[in-house]
Structure formats: C-alpha cells, structure tokens
C-alpha cells in the first residue's frame, strides 16, 4: 500500500490453501518414571559400603589392634555388638601362642 488512502488495487489476496502438515506423532515414548523407580530400588537393594576403622585391644596382651573393614552401616553395627559380646580380637604377636 502506498499513500494515505486504501484502495482495492493495493490489497493482494493469496487464496492458495497452505500445504497440509501432519501433526500426528507416531512415536511411542518409554515411561521414564519406571526407570527412575528401578534406579531407586536398585540403590536400596545394594546399600552403600564404606570403610570403617576399628580400634580395640588384643585379648592376650592388651595392646591396641587396628582393623579397617568395608561394610554397610548395618553390618558395622553387628560387628560392634559382637565386639561388645563374646568376640575377641587377637594381635599378630599373640596369634601363634593361642
């Protein structure tokens, strides 16, 4: 359009229909929430193992004995209960004597 007044000559209509575009998507999405649940369950099935240092006394000579174990927190609690009970640790010097 040129000028201040609109005339019919200035209006151009393009009456061709637009190209049809298929908006349907035929892909099937995998439900990712199932994978996330499996990962969380997988972590729960194998608890995290850590290193724990145990310092105790030899039952033969009362010298300090240091152990480093790798286990879960639940397992280290069981070791603690055993050490408080009847389990005794023997140092390498006293081991051949018993």
From Swiss-Prot:
Q: Which domain of life is it from?
A: Viruses
Keywords on record: Activator, DNA-binding, Early protein, G1/S host cell cycle checkpoint dysregulation by virus, Host cytoplasm, Host nucleus, Host-virus interaction, Inhibition of host innate immune response by virus, Inhibition of host interferon signaling pathway by virus, Interferon antiviral system evasion, Metal-binding, Modulation of host cell cycle by virus, Oncogene, Transcription, Transcription regulation, Viral immunoevasion, Zinc, Zinc-finger
Does Metal-binding appear among the keywords?
yes
* GO terms, molecular function: DNA binding; DNA-binding transcription factor activity; protein domain specific binding; zinc ion binding
**Residues covered by region (E7 terminal domain):** 1-42
State the family it belongs to: Belongs to the papillomaviridae E7 protein family.
Q: State the oligomer form and interacting partners.
A: Homodimer. Homooligomer. Interacts with host RB1; this interaction induces dissociation of RB1-E2F1 complex thereby disrupting RB1 activity. Interacts with host EP300; this interaction represses EP300 transcriptional activity. Interacts with protein E2; this interaction inhibits E7 oncogenic activity. Interacts with host TMEM173/STING; this interaction impairs the ability of TMEM173/STING to sense cytosolic DNA and promote the production of type I interferon (IFN-alpha and IFN-beta).
Q: What is known of its domains?
A: The E7 terminal domain is an intrinsically disordered domain, whose flexibility and conformational transitions confer target adaptability to the oncoprotein. It allows adaptation to a variety of protein targets and exposes the PEST degradation sequence that regulates its turnover in the cell.
Name this protein carries in UniProt: Protein E7
């Amino acid at each position: 359009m040129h000028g201040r007044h609109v005339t019919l000559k200035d209006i151009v209509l393009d009456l061709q229909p637009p190209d049809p575009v298929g908006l349907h998507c035929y892909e099937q999405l995998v439900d990712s929430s199932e994978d996330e649940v499996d990962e969380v369950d997988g972590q729960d099935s194998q608890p995290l193992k850590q290193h724990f240092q145990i310092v105790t006394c030899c039952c033969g000579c009362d010298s300090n004995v240091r152990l480093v174990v790798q286990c879960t927190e639940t397992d280290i609690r069981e070791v603690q209960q055993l050490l408080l009970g009847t389990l005794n640790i023997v140092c390498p010097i006293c081991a051949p004597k018993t």
